[in-house]
Each structure stands twice: as C-alpha cells, then as structure tokens.
Design a protein with these regions (language model features):
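Solvent-exposed, well-ordered amphipathic alpha-helical segments
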Residues: 1-6, 10-14, 49-54, 97, ...
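A conserved beta-strand-loop-helix scaffold within acyl/acetyltransferase catalytic domains
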Residues: 2-74, 131-271
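Tryptophan-centered motif/residue detector
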Residues: 15, 43-45, 285, 313, ...
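Aromatic side chains
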Residues: 18, 28, 33, 88-90, ...
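Low-complexity, flexible helical/coil segments
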Residues: 39-43, 87, 93-103, 161-165, ...
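A broadly tuned preference for mixed-charge, low-complexity surface segments
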Residues: 60-62, 99-111, 116, 175-186, ...
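Active-site/acyl-donor-binding loops of N-acyltransferases
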Residues: 63-67, 133, 141-163, 289-377
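Acyl-donor binding region in acyl/amide transferases
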Residues: 69-145, 255-318
Length: 377
C-alpha cells in the first residue's frame, strides 16, 4: 500500500488540512500561494504528502514541463518530462514531528520514496528554496546538494511595545524614524485590490532603477491575483506625502509570521528613506495584531547594502541562514540536454537549461550522433 499521496491545487481544502496538522506552517506553503504560479499549461502546483501512521511530511512544489524546451525536443526524449522547483519565497519539506532521531528517520524514508516517485514521473531536476525560519535545509539532504546562499533578517515582534521594538534598531534607523514621524509623511494601510496601479508603477520603477533580474518582473496579473487569492492574508503599507505614494510594500502573513514580500519606492524621495518608516509601521502593526516575527529577507547578493539596511532593524538578533537545494535525477540525460544549448553563459544557475540569458539554440541535426549525443567532429 502506498504511503504517499499527491494533491493538486484543485484539492485546496485537503491540501490546507494537511498543513493544519503541522505545528509550524507558513503562507508560502498554502495552496492559495501556489496557485499564483500556475499557468494552466507548463506549470502546476503539487503537494507531496508522505505518511507513516500519524507521522507526516508535506512538500509543496511546482511541477514544470520541460518537454516543450528546444533542447529537450532536439534530444528526442519520449513522453512527458518535468522538473520541480519551489516558487519565489521559501519552501521545502516540513514535518509534524519535533526535532530528533525519529524525525531524521522519517526524512530518510521520505527521501527514498520521493526519489522513486520523481524518477517514475520523469522529473529531471529539483530546486529547493529552503525556509530560513523553519530551518528545514538540515533535515532534507539525502541525494541533495545543499548550499548556503545568504543570510536573512527578521524582527522580533514579541518585545511588547513600540519603544522596545525601536530599541533593537540601529542608531541611524532610530534617528531617521524619529525625524520621519515629524516630517510630512503618513503611513496608510490600504487594500491591495484598490491600489494595483499605484503599487505596480512604483514596483516596476524600482526594478528598473536597480536593473533587477527579469525573474522579479512579475506581471501585473500576478499582483492582481495576489490581492484576490490571498485576501485576508495580504496587507499593503504605503508611505504617503499628502496623496502621493512615495514607498509601498506588500506584506504577506499567516500566524505567527509576516513576510516583507514585494516593495517599491519613488527615487525622488530616497533622501528621506521613507521605507524605514514603512517597515517600522508594518512591524508595529504585526506586533499589535499578535504576530511573533516579521521576516524581511536578505540582500540581492550575499550580505550587501540591502542586507545591511535590513539588519539595522534587528541589531540584537543573529541573522538566519538561507539555503538552496539542487538535485539531478537523471545526470546523463541532464548533461546531454545542456549540451544541446548555446551555453555562452557562466555561473551557478540551476537548472542550466532554464537560464534566462540562454539562447536555447538547438544544435543542428547534422551534429547529432546516432545515440542522441552531440558530435563535436
């Protein structure tokens, strides 16, 4: 008898019922959040549920078709092939067991079962963005290459008062927030549904200013869907100069945690640093509404200036560790696939055949050997 089931997002009630059996859960694991990333064609959400009696491990991910990619077509693989990835945010497998030998054994059994499932399903690769607050990277390692990516920062919301909240800030942040409170700025907690255009304008403008990777350019429909699918679990905080929005942030939440999810600002107001007041107001709101932690995330690359900016909101707390996990289920086929790509790129991108700068130019058919290998003659 099978000890696992696989659910799609259409089984949202059952999906979320399994999450409710966990002591620790987060909005990034919810069926509603995963529905944001489904495209109806090449990408669908799945929840892998592994059960041993009352013991449980759940693992939500995106099942993504690779059969339509030029290099895969050129290789002539039969049937449907896929890879899996956790979406933007944090994820990985989580269990209802407390830390200890019993949970470690359950993860080992889960890993073996999940590996067999992936190979049978023709899943080429797996990419995991582990959850810094849960720390599940240390549990799920069998067959996986796990690497530290960066530190992330969180604000402790259990301190009891606004003055205690501010006491944990760096001296520069304290001064700026005090000045901003007496400046002509106000903070508004708005309904995202009513502010799609305003948020999008500042968000995309900020990405352009930062010359951000294409990965972060979520379409406007994604923002609209966020307002609908996550209703009741999404807040929009805006820093206002009169009726003009000068900084804005989407905060996602599911008790006990909040996440600083997407943000934007008007570069003309950067000298005022209104984002500091925005983050402080969101933290104060979270504290007043019974949340325990406000996760700010990390920098763009390592412990850069953005990381330092966030760290000054939590100077008395140790940063968290953010890990990535990578696995190739069919190594020989993977190497053959990427050999059919125009690989004039470098770096550690995984899986390589999805690199956004990859031309994906297939090798001409006359360069393909009788066994599907690339001929370099």
């Amino acid at each position: 008898m099978s000890n696992f089931i696989v659910l799609g997002s259409s089984s949202s009630a059952e999906w979320d019922a399994y999450l409710n059996q966990l002591e620790t859960k987060d909005i990034y694991f919810s069926s509603a959040f995963f529905r944001l990333f489904e495209d109806g064609e090449h990408q669908q959400a799945e929840l892998f549920v592994f059960k041993q009696g009352d013991q449980l491990i759940v693992y939500p991910y995106l099942l993504r078709s690779i059969s339509h990619l030029p290099a895969v077509i050129q290789l002539g693989l039969e049937g449907d092939w896929y890879d899996i990835s956790t979406p933007y945010g944090y994820g990985g497998p989580i269990s209802n067991l407390p830390p200890g030998a019993e949970r470690s054994e359950l993860y080992q059994q889960f890993s073996e079962t999940f590996t067999d499932y992936c190979r049978e399903k023709k899943i080429m690769t797996e990419f995991v963005r582990f959850h810094p607050l849960i720390g599940n990277a240390t549990e799920y390692q069998s067959g996986l290459t796990t690497e530290w990516n960066r530190n992330t920062i969180y604000i402790d919301l259990t301190v009891g008062s606004e003055s205690e909240l501010i006491r944990h800030y760096g001296s520069n942040h304290k001064r700026n927030i005090h000045k901003l409170k007496s400046a002509p700025f106000t903070i508004r907690n708005s309904n995202l549904k009513d502010r799609i255009e305003s948020f999008s304008e500042l968000y995309y403008g900020t990405l352009n200013d930062l010359q951000a990777d294409s990965f972060y350019y979520f379409p406007k429909k994604f923002i609209e869907d966020t307002s609908h699918l996550l209703e009741g679990r999404v807040e929009l905080f805006e820093a206002m100069d009169g009726e003009k929005t000068v900084a804005t942030s989407i905060v996602l939440h599911e008790r006990p945690w909040m996440h600083y999810h997407l943000c934007g600002w008007d570069r003309a107001y950067l000298q005022w640093s209104p984002t500091k007041l925005l983050i402080h107001a969101a933290a104060k709101w979270g504290m007043e509404n019974g949340f325990e932690c406000f996760h700010l995330g990390g920098g763009y690359k390592g412990n850069d200036d953005l990381f330092q900016f966030k760290h000054r909101f939590a100077t008395q707390l140790e940063p968290l560790d953010y890990y990535l996990g990578k696995r190739i289920f069919f190594p020989e086929l993977y190497e053959r696939i990427i050999s059919f790509c125009d690989t004039r790129i470098s770096g550690n991108y995984f899986p390589l055949y999805r690199h956004p700068d990859l031309d994906m130019i297939c090798i001409p058919s006359e360069e393909i050997g009788p066994n599907g290998e690339r001929s370099f003659a």
